[in-house]
């Protein structure tokens, strides 16, 4: 992703003059990553060179995150560091949406600000910057959602792709700034999503990850009711072996959705459930009051319908007013439910959210201690869940390969990219090695808290094992 580019104007057929290279710095979540990929695609189509190395360009587009304070600080550090190197900046993403005027005032090197609903105009913005203008392109209320027709330059490698099924969120959780930064939910049509999935299949994608703010709410704004189940069934015809769903709000996992998880062969039984807490009073303060009656019942239903389900959740400790008894309720819930993967965060007050003004804040040292206690509680559970896979032969998507040792690193279906573990793969007795982007059968022989290990299984070995089992 570097160097200059020559291009032809799609409308006139005339050659475009060589245009400069633009560097990109990406921060934040995979939803933000898709926005970055669209900006890359638009600029490449317009004839610009694009690069992930800031040294290749004088101008850097920084797609920022503003979800929590730590993310904002990382974004600001990145901006200041690039500015001190003498780079000109186009600031995009959530931080731009959140603090547009302040950023323009405090960072003279910022030549443009581009909001979360305006990145489709990146070429026009860049041309204005090249003409000497200083640009503020931020819609007060984001309404745009990209579809399969918007150019895209993927950054995740050949085998894995994220597919955004909707943008924005209609919920108003007390701790979350995202609706303010991304707007209300706006879903793409099933036909649009399936069309892009087919495009990605043709590019060699082996794992497709469906994302939005609340994926189980997909379609409510467009069709009058959620239609995730229908979408999953439609994606069953796409030639991609793994389809993974992220951000499943618990109340949206209806019997129809669980049936789609069960019945559509390429939909993985991997459920990413951001439950946040277990205690009814804390959930009420989080403006998620309906969830308290759902958590345990839903998890029982999932395990009944999907016995092989892989369960991931995220939890928040130290929410304002969280008592020791309420925290112990959460600890008991975590110990009882035995999730495969858990992300635990301390509460971060965000300006503009209801939770930022709540009384009875929990001291940082107590919140951190609670987080540490939950992590300590979860580690042996995760280790045991991983150990239960020892002896199984599973498909592993190889993502890295060391030619000198033959070792490979990949993931099986129980691990999502970046947030979960990996599988360390030895080549096997026959020395079989495969390139990244390939799926290979692996017998799992080892496990720890986070990762698995194993060796490639030959066809002859699989035949012998099948005969022995009959």
Swiss-Prot record:
The protein's Enzyme Commission number: 2.8.4.4
Binding annotation for [4Fe-4S] cluster 2: 169, 173, 176
Species in which this protein is naturally found: Synechococcus sp. (strain CC9311)
Subcellular location: Cytoplasm
GO biological process, one term: tRNA modification
Family: Belongs to the methylthiotransferase family. RimO subfamily.
Name under which the protein is recorded: Ribosomal protein uS12 methylthiotransferase RimO
Binding site for [4Fe-4S] cluster 1: 29, 65, 94
Catalyzed chemical reaction(s): L-aspartate(89)-[ribosomal protein uS12]-hydrogen + (sulfur carrier)-SH + AH2 + 2 S-adenosyl-L-methionine = 3-methylsulfanyl-L-aspartate(89)-[ribosomal protein uS12]-hydrogen + (sulfur carrier)-H + 5'-deoxyadenosine + L-methionine + A + S-adenosyl-L-homocysteine + 2 H(+)
Xref: NCBIfam families: 30S ribosomal protein S12 methylthiotransferase RimO (TIGR01125), MiaB/RimO family radical SAM methylthiotransferase (TIGR00089)
């Amino acid at each position: 992703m570097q160097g200059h580019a020559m291009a032809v104007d799609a409308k006139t057929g005339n050659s475009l003059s060589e245009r400069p290279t633009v560097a990109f710095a990406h921060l934040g979540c995979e939803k933000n990553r898709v926005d970055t990929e669209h900006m890359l695609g638009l600029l490449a189509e317009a004839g610009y060179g694009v690069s992930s190395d800031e040294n290749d360009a004088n101008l850097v587009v920084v797609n920022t995150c503003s979800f929590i304070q730590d993310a904002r600080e990382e974004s600001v550090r990145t901006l200041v560091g690039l500015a001190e190197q003498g780079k000109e900046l186009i600031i995009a993403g959530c931080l731009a949406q959140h603090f547009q005027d302040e950023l323009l005032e405090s960072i003279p090197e910022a030549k443009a600000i581009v909001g979360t609903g305006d990145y489709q105009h990146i070429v026009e913005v860049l041309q204005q910057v090249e003409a000497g203008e200083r640009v503020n392109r931020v819609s007060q209320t984001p309404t745009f959602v990209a579809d399969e027709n918007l150019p895209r330059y993927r950054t995740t490698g050949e085998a894995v792709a994220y597919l955004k099924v909707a943008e924005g969120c209609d919920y108003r959780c007390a701790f979350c700034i995202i609706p303010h930064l991304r707007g209300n939910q706006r879903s793409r049509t099933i036909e649009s999503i399936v069309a892009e999935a087919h495009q990605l299949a043709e590019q060699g994608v082996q794992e497709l990850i469906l994302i939005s703010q609340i994926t189980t709410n997909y379609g409510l704004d467009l069709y009058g009711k959620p239609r995730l189940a229908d979408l999953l069934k439609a994606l069953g015809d796409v030639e991609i072996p793994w389809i993974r769903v992220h951000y499943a709000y618990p109340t949206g996992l209806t019997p129809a959705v669980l049936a789609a998880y069960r019945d559509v062969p390429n939909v993985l039984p991997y459920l990413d459930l951001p439950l946040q807490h277990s205690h009814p009073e804390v959930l009420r303060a989080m403006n998620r009051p309906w969830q308290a009656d759902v958590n345990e019942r839903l998890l029982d239903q999932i395990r009944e319908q999907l016995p092989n389900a892989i369960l991931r959740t995220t939890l928040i400790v130290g929410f304002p007013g969280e008592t020791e008894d309420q925290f112990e309720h959460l600890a008991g819930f975590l110990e009882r439910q035995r999730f495969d993967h858990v992300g635990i965060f301390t509460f971060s007050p965000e300006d503009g959210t209801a939770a930022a003004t709540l009384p009875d804040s929990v001291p940082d040292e107590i919140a951190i201690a609670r987080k540490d206690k939950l992590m300590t509680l979860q580690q042996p559970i995760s280790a045991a869940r991983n150990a239960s896979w020892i002896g199984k032969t599973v498909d592993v998507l190889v993502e890295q390969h060391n030619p000198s040792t033959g070792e490979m690193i990949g993931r099986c279906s129980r691990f999502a990219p970046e947030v979960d573990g990996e599988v360390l793969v030895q080549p096997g007795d026959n020395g079989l090695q495969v390139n990244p982007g390939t799926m290979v059968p692996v017998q799992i022989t080892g496990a720890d808290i986070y990762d698995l290990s194993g060796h490639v299984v030959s066809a002859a070995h699989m035949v012998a094992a099948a005969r022995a089992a009959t």
